[in-house]
Structures are given as C-alpha cells and as structure tokens.
Amino acid sequence: MIRINNLQKNFGTKKAVDIENYTIGQGDMLGLVGNNGAGKTTLFRLILDLLQADRGNVTINDIDVSKSEDWKNFTGAFIDDGFLIDYLTPEEYFYFIGKMYGLKKEEVDERLLPFERFMIGEVMGQKKFIRNYSAGNKQKIGIISAMLHHPQLLILD
C-alpha cells in the first residue's frame, strides 16, 4: 500500500530521513518510536506530500503522492492541530470535512455515532470554536475527522 523509494530529506547538514526502500502492506500497522528530532513527523509529512523530498519518492497504492492527489480519496491523516480549522465549531468542521468527501450532513451524523461516547459533553454541542478546546479534545476532533470518510489508510502522528 505504501512504498518508500530512496527517500531522503535534509535540513542543512542534518539528515532527517534516509530510507532506501520500505513497504507497508495492506492491513499492516506501523508505529514509529524515536527521540524528538529523529524525523518521525518529517517522514509523515513526506508521505502526505506536505514536504518535498530532496531525493526519492513515496507511492500509495502505486500512486506517486507528489504527482497526483488521487490517493487522498482513500487516505485519512492527522498530524497536529495545525490541520484543524480552529475558527469552526467541531460540528461545522466535521460537516466541512464530510463535504470535501461528498458526504451529506445525514451521512456525517451517522458516521459520528460510533464516536459519541468520546464527544458528548466534551466536544459536541458545546457551541465553541475548536481553538478553545484542550489539546486532548483537539486530538479527538482531528482523529475523528481523519476517519470520517472511512479511509483505507490512516496516518496519525
């Protein structure tokens, strides 16, 4: 599903990412553990084409992420709360994300049901902007929005 080929990213003289070849198959789960500054977030940003590699490429389902955006239709991601539109309420944000994937309001409401117990009283119905939530609740909002369209691939940092 994800293929990394000769991927390299440097920041000045610091080599942040240097992966010769690596494949993550369908159904695989991978966790990255490392010190601060080890390149974990940089790798996620390269995979999601949020950062340009110095060398190499990433393909998702044989689609080069730097040449096509088709992979976004079946990929969900949440890296940090910078992904969130913080001047919206969570409800507005979920409907916005749903609309991006062609979901109607009713479909979004239905897809939010499994997450109700994590959100009732804390996130949903509060009528406040995302910027006013705790870091933990912002993470909940981001993770749920990444899963809203039932992606085949989920990338979380």
Task: Report residues per predicted region.
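Conserved structural motif at the start of ABC-family nucleotide-binding domains
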Residues: 2, 17-19, 72
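Conserved ABC ATPase signature
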Residues: 129-134
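The feature captures the beta-strand-to-loop junction immediately N-terminal to the Walker
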Residues: 30-35
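A short, proline-enriched helix->beta-strand linker immediately N-terminal to the Walker B motif
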Residues: 148-152
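Hydrophobic anchor residue at the start of the ABC signature
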Residues: 143
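Helix-to-loop junction immediately C-terminal to a conserved catalytic motif
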Residues: 48
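Conserved ABC transporter NBD signature motif
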Residues: 56-71
